[in-house]
Regions:
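Cofactor-pocket helix-loop regions in the catalytic cores of large enzyme subunits
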Residues: 1-182
C-alpha cells in the first residue's frame, strides 16, 4: 500500500474502489469506507457485482469481466483529452508519457463503453470525478489481480494515479487489499 488505511479513508475527497468488496472481505476497512462516504467522500465503484457499497456510490461501473485494462485506458484517455493531467507531476516524476498517451488514444469513450458494457456518461463521470479530486485513493483487490491481465491492470492503475499526481501525498495512492501483507 502506498498510504495508510486511516489516510485513504479520512483524507480523501473521492475513493475509487476497484474489484473489491471490503464490507465482505475486509470489514473494518469496509466500515471505514462507508463512514467516509457518510461524511461526504464521494465513492466510485468499479465492479460487475452489486456489492453493498455500490448503493452508496456516486457512480457504479459494472464492467464486463476481463475488461479492466480497457476501462483504465479509457479513463486515462479521457483524463488526457479533458486536460486533467497533472503536468508538473508527470514532467518531474515520471517517464514515458508520450508512449502512454499514444497507447490510450485508441480507447475512446465510445469504444470503451462497448468493450466494457457500460455507459459513456458513467465512464466520463468517473474519470472527471477521480481526476479533479484533490485527494483520491485507488483501492483494489482480487477483482483486479486474479485475471490473466492482473499485472497489466495494477500497472495501469499506477499509471493513472501518476497521470493525475495522486501518488506520494495524503489521501491518494494505489492501495491493494489482500489477506496478507506484501502479497
Amino acid at each position: 500500500m502506498t498510504n495508510t488505511i486511516y489516510d485513504i479513508t479520512h483524507d480523501a475527497d473521492v475513493i475509487l474502489l476497484f474489484g473489491s468488496n471490503p464490507e465482505e472481505a475486509h470489514p473494518v476497512i469496509g466500515m471505514q469506507i462507508r463512514q467516509a462516504v457518510q461524511n461526504g467522500t464521494k465513492l466510485i465503484v468499479v465492479d460487475p457485482r452489486d456489492i453493498n457499497l455500490a448503493g452508496a456510490a456516486s457512480v457504479h461501473l459494472k464492467l464486463k469481466p476481463g475488461t479492466n485494462v480497457a476501462f483504465i485506458n479509457g479513463m486515462m484517455n479521457l483524463i488526457i483529452q479533458k486536460g486533467l493531467v497533472d503536468k508538473e507531476f508527470v514532467e518531474n516524476r515520471t517517464e514515458g508519457y508520450e508512449k502512454l498517451a499514444e497507447t490510450v488514444r485508441e480507447y475512446t469513450p465510445e469504444k470503451v463503453a462497448e468493450i466494457c458494457h457500460i455507459r459513456v456518461e458513467d465512464l466520463e463521470k468517473a474519470a472527471v470525478m477521480y481526476a479533479r479530486a484533490e485527494a483520491a485513493p485507488i483501492i483494489y483487490c482480487l477483482g483486479v489481480t486474479e485475471h490473466s491481465t492482473g499485472t497489466q491492470g495494477v500497472m495501469s492503475l499506477a499509471n493513472m494515479a501518476m497521470l493525475v499526481g495522486k501518488l506520494g501525498k495524503p489521501g491518494c495512492g494505489v492501495n491493494p487489499l489482500r489477506g496478507q501483507n506484501n502479497v
